Amino acid sequence: MIAKNFLLLLCFIALVNVESSPDEAVMIALRDSLKLSGNPNWSGSDPCKWSMFIKCDASNRVTAIQIGDRGISGKLPPDLGKLTSLTKFEVMRNRLTGPIPSLAGLKSLVTVYANDNDFTSVPEDFFSGLSSLQHVSLDNNPFDSWVIPPSLENATSLVDFSAVNCNLSGKIPDYLFEGKDFSSLTTLKLSYNSLVCEFPMNFSDSRVQVLMLNGQKGREKLHGSISFLQKMTSLTNVTLQGNSFSGPLPDFSGLVSLKSFNVRENQLSGLVPSSLFELQSLSDVALGNNLLQGPTPNFTAPDIKPDLNGLNSFCLDTPGTSCDPRVNTLLSIVEAFGYPVNFAEKWKGNDPCSGWVGITCTGTDITVINFKNLGLNGTISPRFADFASLRVINLSQNNLNGTIPQELAKLSNLKTLDVSKNRLCGEVPRFNTTIVNTTGNFEDCPNGNAGKKASSNAGKIVGSVIGILLALLLIGVAIFFLVKKKMQYHKMHPQQQSSDQDAFKITIENLCTGVSESGFSGNDAHLGEAGNIVISIQVLRDATYNFDEKNILGRGGFGIVYKGELHDGTKIAVKRMESSIISGKGLDEFKSEIAVLTRVRHRNLVVLHGYCLEGNERLLVYQYMPQGTLSRHIFYWKEEGLRPLEWTRRLIIALDVARGVEYLHTLAHQSFIHRDLKPSNILLGDDMHAKVADFGLVRLAPEGTQSIETKIAGTFGYLAPEYAVTGRVTTKVDVYSFGVILMELLTGRKALDVARSEEEVHLATWFRRMFINKGSFPKAIDEAMEVNEETLRSINIVAELANQCSSREPRDRPDMNHVVNVLVSLVVQWKPTERSSDSEDIYGIDYDTPLPQLILDSCFFGDNTLTSIPSRPSELESTFKSGQGR
């Protein structure tokens, strides 16, 4: 009897096990959490008896959930990871929301298709223990920003992994390209995300066939070289469109199965390799909107459809036509630098003598190659020696390594070779008459021979140091006596003007500096006695297309400002002075005042590069500011199609202007009062930092001359009361104008706007009234700005500062150093760019430099106030921070 009862109990337990599968509770929770459409027949408690979309094995364990394309909505329950026999999880193309539950530990899981839903997140352990996982698709889900979790490294059976348009960020893991661990992975699709990495280069034996990484979002995107492709010899389809990849195309000779190759809209440069356009398997290729150079490729595959439309820098349009030999040689030279983007952007066409950056020609012969301070990496190519006409090679201030090629010693016409301030090593070739500058180079080459030569090198180094010190001592003594003699001469002959032979001159050939045997030739530009650049009228006519009206940037009381472009693309601003403004001023007086202005250098003052005096023409050449005036960005941003300035940017601009004016008032070698400070005299660069323009120009107008419609220099709305009434000028005049500019930055309104109601015409009066009434002041803030509690706090401080600066009595206005201190405390982070000045002479100008490079160097030099202007008086030390750094 006992045995019979025990047998019945065992049967009952077995029956319960059959009826109550371990997966039953999980599946019922799944059913109850979803809103099913149609009639899926999910009734009853046994999921194995539900519709064909649920599959079970012989043990009543759920092995497949295949409910894709069913119009299902709802959230997935968190316990799906308990379905330990699950092999297929397919919920794609529904309306599912919430997080995807963790499936960690499901060793039998092969397929996960969750694409085209509204899932919000992926758990970090999602892929843990999924050793059988082969197929994954997470495309088109609005996940919170996520990265590929480390747990994916366990899924070494992966065949295809797709996470397109699902807010993926960060880096692509190296292991996905390692054939040893992921030998089955053939498809990787990560398009339309926010990936920002450079590709790994140390993987091997990748089996990936389909690689889709196109359309990454954000500013950085995927970048760096694509040379990793040549290691991926199984590739059939590659799509990298819409990223920031740069450098040359790799060797494709090993990619014999490649059918489709799309790298449109990147920054790839260099030549299209023959290994690509001779690839017979290729049927679809897209290279448009890059910076590719050399001849237009001629693809030979029978059914290929090449897409070369859009920007590139091919020398000729006809496929397969060779470039000019000079072009080929120059491209070989920059190949050693990795085909830098700045060359690819500016070297257009098939004639390097037609204005290519860094290239100067005499006739059709290249005589000067000037690649100074271009951030170049790589080595010096021996192909420089192919240009027998070369007289100057300047590769200084780059990051070049390796040795100086022996072939360069064969250049019989070479007069100057400057490779200073690089990372070169090895022996310098023997040149006959060439002046070679190698300072800042030559540590031991990493070739294993340093130890053998250590003892001999030590003696050489000691001898060299002693020789150099003696030479420097002799040179210093010689310079001292020469300068002393010259000073005595000028004291004896104060009225004698320097002739062409007395001035340092710059030779310009084809609007660019070359080298002449005597050192003096050409009249395109030279250095005046004060070291500022004197530029010929012809250069400026060419740069502005003969002062074409289409090039007008603006009109002011002192004349018209034109945009100019030198032959190599360097942009300048040319102010053509009204003849009535300077007619009463003597030539010497005008030149001396220009000399004063060209020496005023600060990062927040627009650089005056030089001038032109020919006949009745009086022209000033300024630094070009690409983003135009501040007024364009605060008053006319809608009309110009610009984005409104956010408050933090306005605050930084205010600080920039304050620093510039502070420098003029107290820190320059002599005090300046601007007298016409306003948004149209504040210019913005591409980095949206501000520089003050037209400072000191009132000095160029003779007494009594009207600079605008008033009898004084200034603009209504910005004029301090005492200046407008009496003409009395102090630095507090500029402080008042600055206060009005702060009001404009805060409100987006003009200082004087006759289109407004009578009580709102004058901004300063209206602003004070609004500020006093705290309840109405928020209405005065520019609606284009987003304002929160934090910004409102700083806005109130700046508003109070604006009122102080525009006080009626000058004594109630703060000095600009106080203004700077207030604004500095509000700008959370401001880090000045560190730049070192490298003076070539007493004026910091290299006479063998092309005019465009002089302009660039002048901008560079202008950023270093400590080298161009004497330091501030010591008694200001406790009051001011650095005039450059604040």
UniProtKB/Swiss-Prot annotation:
<comment type="function">
    <text>Involved in auxin signal transduction and cell expansion and proliferation regulation.</text>
</comment>
<keyword id="KW-0808">Transferase</keyword>
<protein>
    <recommendedName>
        <fullName>Receptor-like kinase TMK2</fullName>
        <ecNumber>2.7.11.1</ecNumber>
    </recommendedName>
</protein>
<feature type="glycosylation site" description="N-linked (GlcNAc...) asparagine">
    <location>
        <position position="298"/>
    </location>
</feature>
<keyword id="KW-0732">Signal</keyword>
<dbReference type="GO" id="GO:0016020">
    <property type="term" value="C:membrane"/>
</dbReference>
<feature type="disulfide bond">
    <location>
        <begin position="315"/>
        <end position="323"/>
    </location>
</feature>
<keyword id="KW-0547">Nucleotide-binding</keyword>
<keyword id="KW-0812">Transmembrane</keyword>
<feature type="disulfide bond">
    <location>
        <begin position="48"/>
        <end position="56"/>
    </location>
</feature>
<dbReference type="InterPro" id="IPR003591">
    <property type="entry name" value="Leu-rich_rpt_typical-subtyp"/>
</dbReference>
<feature type="disulfide bond">
    <location>
        <begin position="353"/>
        <end position="361"/>
    </location>
</feature>
<feature type="repeat" description="LRR 5">
    <location>
        <begin position="157"/>
        <end position="179"/>
    </location>
</feature>
<feature type="glycosylation site" description="N-linked (GlcNAc...) asparagine">
    <location>
        <position position="394"/>
    </location>
</feature>
<feature type="glycosylation site" description="N-linked (GlcNAc...) asparagine">
    <location>
        <position position="401"/>
    </location>
</feature>
<dbReference type="Pfam" id="PF08263">
    <property type="entry name" value="LRRNT_2"/>
</dbReference>
<feature type="repeat" description="LRR 6">
    <location>
        <begin position="182"/>
        <end position="206"/>
    </location>
</feature>
<feature type="repeat" description="LRR 10">
    <location>
        <begin position="281"/>
        <end position="302"/>
    </location>
</feature>
<dbReference type="GO" id="GO:0106310">
    <property type="term" value="F:protein serine kinase activity"/>
</dbReference>
<dbReference type="InterPro" id="IPR052422">
    <property type="entry name" value="Auxin_Ser/Thr_Kinase"/>
</dbReference>
<feature type="repeat" description="LRR 7">
    <location>
        <begin position="208"/>
        <end position="232"/>
    </location>
</feature>
<dbReference type="GO" id="GO:0004674">
    <property type="term" value="F:protein serine/threonine kinase activity"/>
</dbReference>
<dbReference type="InterPro" id="IPR011009">
    <property type="entry name" value="Kinase-like_dom_sf"/>
</dbReference>
<feature type="transmembrane region" description="Helical">
    <location>
        <begin position="461"/>
        <end position="481"/>
    </location>
</feature>
<dbReference type="Pfam" id="PF13855">
    <property type="entry name" value="LRR_8"/>
</dbReference>
<feature type="repeat" description="LRR 1">
    <location>
        <begin position="59"/>
        <end position="83"/>
    </location>
</feature>
<keyword id="KW-0418">Kinase</keyword>
<comment type="similarity">
    <text>Belongs to the protein kinase superfamily. Ser/Thr protein kinase family.</text>
</comment>
<feature type="glycosylation site" description="N-linked (GlcNAc...) asparagine">
    <location>
        <position position="167"/>
    </location>
</feature>
<feature type="repeat" description="LRR 8">
    <location>
        <begin position="233"/>
        <end position="254"/>
    </location>
</feature>
<feature type="topological domain" description="Extracellular">
    <location>
        <begin position="21"/>
        <end position="460"/>
    </location>
</feature>
<keyword id="KW-1133">Transmembrane helix</keyword>
<keyword id="KW-0675">Receptor</keyword>
<feature type="repeat" description="LRR 3">
    <location>
        <begin position="107"/>
        <end position="129"/>
    </location>
</feature>
<feature type="repeat" description="LRR 4">
    <location>
        <begin position="131"/>
        <end position="155"/>
    </location>
</feature>
<dbReference type="GO" id="GO:0005524">
    <property type="term" value="F:ATP binding"/>
</dbReference>
<feature type="repeat" description="LRR 2">
    <location>
        <begin position="84"/>
        <end position="106"/>
    </location>
</feature>
<feature type="active site" description="Proton acceptor">
    <location>
        <position position="676"/>
    </location>
</feature>
<keyword id="KW-0433">Leucine-rich repeat</keyword>
<dbReference type="InterPro" id="IPR032675">
    <property type="entry name" value="LRR_dom_sf"/>
</dbReference>
<feature type="glycosylation site" description="N-linked (GlcNAc...) asparagine">
    <location>
        <position position="377"/>
    </location>
</feature>
<dbReference type="InterPro" id="IPR001611">
    <property type="entry name" value="Leu-rich_rpt"/>
</dbReference>
